From Swiss-Prot:
Name of the gene: era
GO cellular component, one term: plasma membrane
Gene3D superfamilies per the UniProt record, alphabetical: 3.30.300.20, P-loop containing nucleotide triphosphate hydrolases (3.40.50.300)
KW rRNA-binding (keyword) present: yes
GO molecular function, one term: small ribosomal subunit rRNA binding
Biological source species: Caldanaerobacter subterraneus subsp. tengcongensis (strain DSM 15242 / JCM 11007 / NBRC 100824 / MB4) (Thermoanaerobacter tengcongensis)
Protein's name in the database: GTPase Era
Region of interest called G5, as start-end residue ranges on this chain: 150-152
Chain residue ranges for the region called G2: 38-42
Positions of region (G1): 12-19
Role this protein plays: An essential GTPase that binds both GDP and GTP, with rapid nucleotide exchange. Plays a role in 16S rRNA processing and 30S ribosomal subunit biogenesis and possibly also in cell cycle regulation and energy metabolism.
């Protein structure tokens, strides 16, 4: 049996479960997950390598109407991804009608030649009849190569989906070494873990107006300890107060939760220090967005 390797895009509306699926397949926390929309900013590659195949997953930001330079970047990344991969997984919820968000995505899919598998997620939340009806509705709009109904959070049919993905991969050598799980820089992984905790603990408006910049990551020579210094930047003074919280309790809660995940990631004790600063209008600052890795090459 020839070795197979290829790139697979995860695409869909915000919050349909793309990152949850990626993490379930890889058994590692690679993509940031949260119940709030627009939580994935960077194109994150999760890499699954076996003796027979290698799948490089590209987890795109959700497509939505742009409201800032940052969201324009997110949408441009998602649209370009469609043309640069071997297979697209189009993830939807079991809706019995197609809303404007999915209509916009379907229109974009019709502009590319890449094969598409329809992945209907969250089947554990609705009756089977509704799942079947949703599949009929979406199949009437697009000629999908295959359809798989799953529950990413429970792992239902995830292995079935994995087998179907492999069948679409081209024959060829692996792109990454066996022990690679993601090609994200270390500081980006740390920053995303911290930002994920803010998404869980803070009010709806605040987390999407923040970014995390990791100043330093140092391993102590004499002890099994990793020292991490990071800055949380927000757009408003009022947001700074919310992030810090009364007597610093909210920042402490964010730091403790992030530290637990970071200690699991590093396999050793982590000493995490967080600071909060205000940087007004950062989401429309092209120079800063480019520095943070959000810029699109024209």
């Amino acid at each position: 049996m020839a070795y197979r390797a290829g790139f697979v895009a995860l695409i869909g509306r915000t919050n349909v479960g793309k990152s949850t699926l990626l993490n379930a397949i890889l058994k590692e926390k690679v993509a940031i997950t949260s119940p709030k929309p627009q939580t994935t900013r960077n194109t994150i590659r999760g890499i699954l390598t076996t003796e027979d195949y290698q799948i490089i997953f590209v987890d795109t930001p959700g497509i939505h109407k742009p409201k800032s330079k940052l969201s324009e970047f997110m949408i441009e990344v998602a649209k370009r991804t469609l043309k640069d991969v071997d297979l697209i997984l189009y993830m939807v919820e079991p809706d019995t009608s197609i809303g404007p968000g999915d209509r916009y995505i379907l229109d974009n899919l019709k502009e590319v030649d890449t094969p598409v598998i329809l992945v209907v997620n969250k089947i554990d939340l609705v009756p089977a009849e509704r799942v079947e009806e949703a599949i009929k509705v979406f199949k009437s709009e697009y000629n999908f190569k295959d359809v798989v109904a799953i529950s990413a959070s429970l792992g239902t049919n995830v292995e079935v989906l994995k087998e179907k993905i492999v069948s679409f991969l081209p024959e060829g050598p692996r792109y990454y070494l066996d022990d690679y799980i993601t090609d994200q820089p270390e500081k980006l992984i740390v920053a995303e873990i911290i930002r994920e905790k803010m998404l869980y603990f803070l009010e709806e408006e605040v987390p999407h107006g923040v970014y995390v910049e990791v100043e330093s990551i140092k391993e102590r020579e004499d002890k099994e300890i990793v020292d991490i210094d990071a800055y949380i930047y927000c757009e408003k003074e009022s947001h700074k107060g919310i992030i810090i919280g009364k007597n610093g309790q909210m920042l402490k809660k964010i730091g403790q939760a992030a530290r637990q995940d970071l200690e699991e990631f590093y396999g050793k004790q982590v000493f995490l220090q967080l600071w909060v600063k205000v940087r007004k209008g950062w989401r429309d600052n092209e120079k800063l967005l480019r520095k943070l890795g959000y810029a699109i090459d024209k």
